[in-house]
């Protein structure tokens, strides 16, 4: 029966093992700085094995480096003795939700998630500090004491990670930002699945360095795109140019494995359709409407609709060529007003005469004012709503800013909900995990829930945020939000409540006759604007028949549940060791222990957890049942053979208990025999 590690993996050790497996003859022994014999890699032997050019000393080479880069790599690889403690009182629907909200330093949280979520995340979106000269960034300096942090900055967390303003007068301006972002990106790569993708928002200050970081970590060939994201809200802190754009860097874990089919809805299509329909209702002629739409599509917000400059009762459409190369279909098409044959080109029509007549009868042909204009086919926007995402995007952030201000959350430049929904929808699936480890006001969580409500998806979110204190002068602080995590959690609660209320209202609306037949939705959309609106609401009611997960489990990063003696028993005198009744900290609950066990065993933190109470003989006991017997954890004291036998008969995959919980020496002696009899395949672990 083995003891659990109860600490994160040492990536440097893992890398050593990989090299040793590939090149065992390169493994040797040497003396370290403490005089101990340790295993090492013989560089000369390794170079012989891989037979490649080695760049030595000051020899010129292309490289991306900065002061403390080596320290950043070591920081990413170093293990930590931390845990995530559940907080039921701040959670929503803790027992049933599959969403997570994690409070803590995101570097530490990423390390804690590293084994459990290794290769399991399909999409990561982050909006890190932009390093504008007035940002707060993490300074991962674990050597200084908390008192020293207080003296240096006046801003720190209980683990000794401080937040410092990275002013552009600082000589380490880019270095500090790189030291912050680099180790986090390295660990994030491990969390991505082979077909996973990562999106990162950034501006001009660090786009170059961020691109180089991602090229080094992911490989230059896995950079998919750098989107330019335009906004209608200018940042008034620029001296010469009003900045109205930023960037969205998209990188794949492995581009060869990344799924194709990135068909996304055109941005701002609802707004464009609404304006077009208003023009139809205004009574203007087709030519007048065409002129107004030509002017409208010159605005960045509507540039995707530059061909959809006509509109009728069905909606906006683009005029397409009715001829086809090599076609021999030659016949007269009669103008509906002049009753004369329309102009034809050198090529034949793309449709047979009977097919053309059906298109005319159903008003799918656009005729000119006279027969001198060649007729064209109406291609409607609702038939072409999805396409490959464009590299230039436009999103209105004002609505999100107004909503945030109304909630008194105190964020000056929140990301637009529609923008994050668009980013998430680029991944061609509706059931996957979304991770945001700079979650801020939790826009990503809001977007995931909203998108699920709209398309019936089953996406899940993991939000990670440091509980950074809010400014005492801010509206958020005055409204009672003492740190950013309080804002994020409250936003998810309110957004979830709004989504649930909307669903309930839609469910109360009786289905119309046509709503029950999905195949009729497209056909009734061709019968007028009212039918289009009716179709849209019908889709919404059908979508809302599925339940949206608007809950979340709150987990908080904290020191390990285990006392120091658990990790370094050799450093304690035997007399002291024997007096320690337990190696678990006194203030930790059984559920605290369960979540650290789940992390150690690689069990997803949103797994189904049931607390069961049983009675065997005269003895009552309780235990945690995770995922219907995949893990059974019993942290009761004085566990006897009857309890061990009852648990073994359930045949769990894992069984975990306290090392100190066995009632007597007889239980310890017979423990393995009991499991060998009833459940020999169960993996047994102790704390």
Model-derived features: positions:
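DnaQ-like (DEDDh/DEDDy) 3′-5′ exonuclease domain used for proofreading
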Residues: 1-125, 130-183, 527-538, 545-547, ...
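PRPP-dependent phosphoribosyltransferase catalytic core
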Residues: 2, 450-687
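Segments forming glycine/polar-rich beta-alpha architectures that bind adenosine-containing cofactors
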Residues: 112, 116-117, 125, 268, ...
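Conserved proline-anchored active-site loop of SAM-dependent methyltransferases
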Residues: 120-137, 214, 434-448, 598
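Conserved S-adenosyl-L-methionine
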Residues: 140-148, 178, 205-210, 416-498
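Conserved Class I SAM-dependent methyltransferase catalytic core
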Residues: 164-224, 482-508, 534, 560
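Signature of N6-adenine DNA methyltransferases within the class I
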Residues: 181, 194-195, 204-271
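Flexible, glycine-/basic-rich loop-and-beta segments that form/coincide
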Residues: 235-306, 561-564
């Amino acid at each position: 029966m083995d003891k659990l590690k109860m600490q994160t993996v040492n990536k440097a050790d893992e890398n050593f093992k990989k090299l040793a497996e590939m090149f065992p003859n390169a493994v040797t022994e040497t003396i370290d700085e403490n005089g101990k014999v340790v295993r090492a890699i013989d560089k000369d032997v390794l170079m012989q094995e891989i037979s490649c050019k080695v760049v030595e000393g000051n020899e010129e080479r292309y490289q991306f480096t900065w002061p403390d880069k080596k320290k950043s790599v070591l920081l990413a690889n170093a293990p930590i003795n931390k845990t995530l403690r559940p907080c039921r009182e701040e959670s929503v629907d803790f027992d049933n939700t599959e969403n997570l909200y994690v409070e803590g330093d995101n570097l530490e949280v990423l390390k804690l998630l590293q084994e459990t979520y290794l290769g399991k995340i399909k999409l990561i979106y982050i909006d890190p500090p932009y390093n504008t000269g007035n940002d707060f960034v993490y300074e991962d300096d674990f050597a200084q004491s908390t008192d020293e942090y207080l003296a240096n900055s006046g801003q720190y967390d209980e683990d000794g990670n401080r937040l410092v303003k990275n002013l552009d007068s600082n000589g380490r301006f880019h270095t500090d930002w790189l030291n912050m972002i680099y180790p986090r990106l390295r660990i994030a790569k491990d969390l991505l699945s082979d077909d996973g993708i990562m999106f990162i928002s950034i501006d001009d200050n660090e786009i170059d360095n961020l691109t180089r970081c991602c090229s080094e970590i992911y490989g230059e060939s896995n950079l998919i795109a750098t989107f330019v994201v335009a906004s209608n809200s200018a940042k008034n802190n620029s001296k010469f140019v009003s900045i109205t754009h930023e960037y969205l860097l998209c990188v794949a874990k492995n581009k060869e494995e990344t799924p194709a089919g990135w068909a996304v809805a055109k941005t701002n299509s609802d707004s464009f359709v609404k304006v077009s329909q208003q023009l139809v209702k205004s009574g203007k002629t087709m030519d007048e409407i065409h002129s107004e739409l030509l002017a409208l599509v010159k605005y960045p917000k509507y540039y995707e609709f530059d061909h959809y400059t006509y509109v009728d009762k069905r909606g906006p459409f683009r005029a397409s060529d009715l001829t086809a190369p090599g076609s021999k279909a030659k016949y007269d098409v009669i103008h509906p007003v002049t009753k004369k044959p329309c102009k034809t080109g050198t090529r034949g029509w793309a449709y047979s005469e009977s097919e053309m007549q059906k298109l005319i009868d159903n008003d799918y042909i656009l005729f000119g004012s006279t027969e001198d204009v060649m007729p064209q086919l109406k291609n409607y926007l609702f038939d072409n709503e999805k396409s490959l995402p464009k590299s230039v995007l436009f999103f209105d952030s004002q609505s999100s800013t107004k909503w945030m201000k109304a909630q008194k959350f105190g964020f000056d430049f929140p990301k637009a909900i529609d923008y994050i929904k668009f980013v998430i929808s680029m991944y061609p699936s509706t059931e996957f995990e979304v991770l945001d480890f700079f979650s801020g006001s939790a826009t990503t969580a809001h977007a995931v829930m909203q998108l699920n409500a709209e398309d019936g998806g089953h996406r899940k979110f993991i939000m990670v945020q440091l509980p950074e204190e809010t400014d005492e002068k801010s509206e958020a602080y005055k409204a009672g939000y003492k740190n950013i995590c309080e804002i994020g959690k409250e936003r998810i609660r309110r957004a979830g409540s709004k989504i649930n209320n909307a669903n309930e209202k839609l469910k109360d609306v009786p289905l119309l006759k046509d709503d029950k037949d999905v195949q009729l939705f497209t056909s009734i959309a061709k019968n007028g604007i009212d039918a289009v609106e009716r179709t849209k609401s019908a889709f919404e009611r059908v979508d809302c028949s599925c339940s949206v997960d608007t809950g979340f489990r709150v987990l908080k990063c904290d020191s390990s549940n285990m006392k120091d003696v658990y990790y370094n028993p050799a450093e304690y005198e035997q007399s002291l060791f024997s007096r320690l009744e337990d190696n678990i900290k006194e203030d930790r609950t059984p559920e605290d222990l369960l979540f650290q066990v789940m992390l150690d065993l690689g069990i997803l933190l949103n797994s189904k957890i049931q607390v069961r109470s049983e009675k065997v003989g005269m003895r009552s006991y309780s235990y945690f049942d995770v995922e219907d017997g995949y893990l059974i954890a019993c942290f009761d004291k004085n566990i006897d053979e009857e309890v061990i036998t009852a648990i073994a008969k359930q045949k769990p995959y894992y069984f975990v208990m306290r090392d100190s919980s066995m009632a007597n020496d007889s239980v310890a002696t017979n423990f393995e025999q009991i499991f060998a009899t009833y459940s020999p395949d169960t993996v047994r672990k102790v704390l």
